[in-house]
Structure formats: structure tokens, C-alpha cells
Amino acid sequence: MPPQKYHCNVCAQDITRSIHIRCVECVDFDLCIPCFTSGASLGTHHPSHPYRIIETNSYPIFDENWGADEELLLIDACETLGLGNWADIADYVGNARTKEECRDHYLKTYIESDCYPLASVELPGPVDRIAFAARKRARIEAFQPPPIIPQKPLASTPQCHEIQGYMPGRLEFDQEYMNEAELPIKDMNFDDDLHESAKHEMQLKLTMLNIYNSRLTRRAVRKQTIFNHNLLDYRRLQANEKRMSKEERNLLNKTKAFARLLTGPDYQKFVNSYHEQITLKKQISDLQEWRQMGLTTLEQGHKYERDKTQKFLLSKASASYDKQLRHVKSFNQTTSAPFQVRDIQKIVPRKPATPTMFSASADRQLLSEDEQALCSKLQIFPKPFLALKFALISASLTSKKPFQKTDAVNLFKHLDANKVEQVYDFFHNARWIGAPT
């Protein structure tokens, strides 16, 4: 319920919060200052009537930050709207007052007063009216929301017509939803014939129009969804999806059906919350697995995950190597000359890996920091390095004598001996292969 407003009876200007004139003889007759000084009259009112000057009473009396007019509005609102309804009371008082401010001021000034049930009228000192007005103005300006900057309208460019099929000036698409909805009614007309047979025909036509209106409603809903979620900016959406991981893209595709039910910000909040829920479930599952394995710290858990991933990749590389070996053996049985791996290298030379290519490799996180530094130095990709690691460790474990550096070089004759020696030294220093010390 808004507070009572006062308007000039001559020009109808709002004079609620400004100084105005009230006629003593006429009932509820108020004048603004310009109409009063010009001697305006209306009805039974005459400029010679006695008058009173009505001020806004914005000077503080109980609190240095609350004016007398706000005190009157607060008491009036509490009496009219009821104590405890502080949200409506704050709207009634206005002047950018919040419900917390109204509640705290009422309790402090009237309930906790030393003169209860009266309010204490003793101010700590004189109040500067100019400073009080400046604080009030700053509070009102800070309460007002910032102006909404209108978005730049889409230009009717060839991109809109050829790629998106959208015409911004008409807010239409080349192919609308249910594009043939207008065909059943395009030749419909209404006659003035009111015979009994014409009434049934009229009812049929009205039913067809209702069906057409329902289709227009569904079309408008889908179009509004496109505008609310800014789906016309497909390049930005594609760029955002490319930066997502595979799991995030799958999650986004699953939740796109809910976009029609939510606004743009609410839908984005829903997607983020859903993704956070899945992430937390995955973390809980990992923690439960770590606890079952006897791990008690996060560092042990991360090391366990790295080792598990490396074990999986090594087993996968071993299976692939066995498959290729069987293929080579079957190929040698059908040819006169044996086929070896170095023959492939002669036919299709490999381009050496660069540090930039290695840093962009998808399997780089499967290696430790020392292994990454070694691969970057020797220009070896992670997957070949893991296969080489598996082969060297397996050969060292199955060797009946201490596995020496020459054994590693002889095992990989088709590879660069210098690289094999450096990899052997790295594994030997890590105590993974070689003679025990």
C-alpha cells in the first residue's frame, strides 16, 4: 500500500515530497508554488483565501540518518500494514530504505528507548541539513539499479540469411516451426450467411483458426527460447563447445531439452550445478576406492590414479604390439623375404617430434615430470615412450642375467642407439631396470 500522495489541484503536479500551499477554507485543496504565486483559482477557491505552508519535514528528530517525514511514514506503515511486515513497510517508506533498516530503526528508536513507549528526542548534536540531504541523495542514487545497456541489434547481413536463415528486421526465419501452418486457412473467408448449414461451416472455420493460433503460440515459444538463450550467435556457441571436454559436451547435450523451461541465466546455473554434482559424485567414488585400497592421503590417491592409467595404457600397448607381431609373422609366411619394422621406417619416414607438438600431446599427463622432461629432450611422444618403457622393464624382468645397456641397444636395433641408451640410463637411475646394487 503506497503512502498518500498530494497533487496540485490546478496543474495536477505531484507535490508529495516538496513544499506546497494548502488552503484553510477549501477542503483538501493544495497548490504548488508556481500556481500559488500566479494567483490561480479553481471552483470555490480564491487567491484571497488564507493558507498554510506545508513542508516536507525532512529534518532528523530521533536519528541523524532518518528524517521526520520518514518517521511519520514508518509509524503510519506499521499501523496500517502491521508489525513484522517489514518488506511492505520498507516499500511504503521509500527513500531506498531496506526492510532491515526499517526493522532495526523501529526497534532501536521506539522499543529500546529509555522513554518507552515514547521515542527519545535527544540527538547527540546538531545535524547539518546539507550533509543530511547529501547522504540521502547518495543513498537513493546507490539504490537505483544501473541502466541496462541495450544490446547491439543484429544486422541483416548475408550471414543471417544464408547460414542462419534469420531476418532481424522481421524477427522471422526462412523456415519457421510448422512452416505450413498457414496453408489450411490461406483461402478461408467469412460470409454473412446465417443459415443453419452456414453455422456448422462457421464452427469448422473457427476450430481451424483455434488450431492455427495454437501453432502460432508454439512457434512463438520456440522463437522466444532462441532469443532468450542467444542461439543465433552460433559461432560463439561452437567456440565454447570446442573448449569443453567430451564429458562436458555430453552433459550439455543431455540438458539442452530443459532450455525451453528456463531463462538463459537459470539454464546456465542449472548446467553448472549439474556438472558440479557429477564431479562431486566422481570424487566421492574415487575417495571410496582409495579408502578400500588403503590410501589415506590425496597424494597417494593421485599417484594411484596415475599408476592405474599407465598400467592400462601399457596393457593396451602390449596387446596392440602382440597383434602387430602376429600380423607380421603371418605376412612373412606368405612372402619370400622377411618383413621387419625398419622396412616401414624406410618407406614412411617419421617427422621428428618438436617440443610444441609434445606439449600439445593428449597423453602427456600420463607421465611424471621427469619423464616429460626426458621425452621433450629426446623428442619422443608419450605413447611410444610408454611402449618402450613396457618393453625394457619386461625384458629386464625376464632376463636370466643382469640386463645391461648393450642388451637394450641390441633389443631395439631399429631405434636410435643414443636415445635407447639415455632411456636406459633414466630407468637404471630410477632403479627400474639393470643389475641390482
Swiss-Prot record:
A biological process term (GO) from this entry: regulation of reciprocal meiotic recombination
Cysteines engaged in disulfide bonds, as pairs: none
A Gene Ontology term for the protein's cellular component: nucleus
Key words of the record: Chromatin regulator, DNA recombination, Meiosis, Metal-binding, Nucleus, Stress response, Transcription, Transcription regulation, Zinc, Zinc-finger
Domain of life of the source: Eukaryota
Binding site for Zn(2+) 1: C8, C11, C32, C35
Assembly and binders: Component of the 1.8 MDa SAGA (Spt-Ada-Gcn5 acetyltransferase) complex, which is composed of 19 subunits tra1, spt7, taf5, ngg1/ada3, sgf73, spt20, spt8, taf12, taf6, hfi1/ada1, ubp8, gcn5, ada2, spt3, sgf29, taf10, taf9, sgf11 and sus1.
This protein's name: SAGA complex subunit Ada2
Species whose genome carries this gene: Schizosaccharomyces pombe (strain 972 / ATCC 24843)
